[in-house]
């Protein structure tokens, strides 16, 4: 939370990882994200997103230590196309969850996303099913899955891996929900009720 404005701050994925894990303990599990088959327009959007964010995709995965204990982490990079999840990002998340299950590691997730990636349409939305299945298998293996909802977490991300934690906490003031206010206003031509989709309101109700 920004002390001056009272609004949530956008930590980068690496800033959050560095704040949570023991210093110097993070090891990435990520491999280069494929872009084959993307249209020229989408490829340019991906290039600009990589340039802006310094990341190759909208999520970073890996492992590190917390007080010396191994944990797996999945953290959104919101500056990469608003943290949206396409097929490459979904595959990265699913692979990380499956590896955490195989290696019997607790899993920490820090989503911050506008949802699935509109440039990829239905396949991106359906990829949430794979992520959800992997998370359920991790939970069924008796392993902790902890979620820190960051500002904002909406759409298919909130409806899938953002909502499956054994323990879920949220950034103060975070916008959380399925249908974001701007989408609601575009659909219904009226403003979304103020304060409904905040972390505090969801906690109270």
Describe each region flagged by the PLM:
Residues 81-85, 117-120:
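A generic structural signal for short coil/turn motifs at secondary-structure boundaries
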Residues 78, 85-94, 110, 124-127, ...:
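Conserved mixed alpha/beta catalytic, RNA-binding, or beta-rich assembly cores of soluble enzyme
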Residues 114-205:
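Conserved catalytic cores of soluble enzyme domains
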Residues 43-45, 74-82:
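Glycine-/proline-rich flexible loop or hinge segments
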Residues 45, 52-58, 83-98:
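Glycine-rich anion/phosphate-binding loops
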Residues 1-58, 63-65:
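Intrinsically disordered, low-complexity segments enriched in small/flexible residues
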Residues 66-77, 92-117:
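A structural preference for short, pocket-lining loop segments at secondary-structure junctions
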């Amino acid at each position: 939370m920004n002390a001056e404005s009272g609004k949530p701050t956008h930590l980068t994925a690496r800033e959050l990882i560095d704040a949570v894990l023991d210093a110097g303990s993070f090891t990435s599990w990520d491999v280069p994200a494929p872009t084959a088959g993307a249209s020229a327009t989408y490829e340019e959007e991906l290039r600009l997103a990589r340039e802006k964010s310094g990341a190759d995709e909208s999520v970073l995965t890996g492992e590190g230590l917390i007080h010396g204990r191994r944990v797996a982490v999945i953290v959104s990079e919101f500056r990469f196309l608003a943290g949206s999840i396409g097929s490459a990002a979904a595959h990265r998340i699913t692979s990380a969850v499956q590896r955490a299950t195989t290696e019997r590691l607790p899993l920490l997730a820090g989503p911050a996303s506008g949802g699935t990636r509109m440039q990829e349409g239905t396949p991106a939305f359906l990829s949430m099913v794979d992520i959800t299945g992997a998370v359920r298998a991790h939970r069924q293996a008796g392993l902790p899955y902890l979620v820190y909802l960051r500002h904002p977490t909406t759409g298919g991300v909130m409806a899938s891996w953002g909502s499956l934690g054994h323990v879920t906490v949220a950034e103060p003031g975070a916008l959380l929900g399925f249908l974001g206010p701007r989408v609601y206003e575009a659909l219904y031509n009226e403003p979304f009720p103020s304060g409904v989709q905040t972390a505090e309101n969801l906690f109270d109700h």
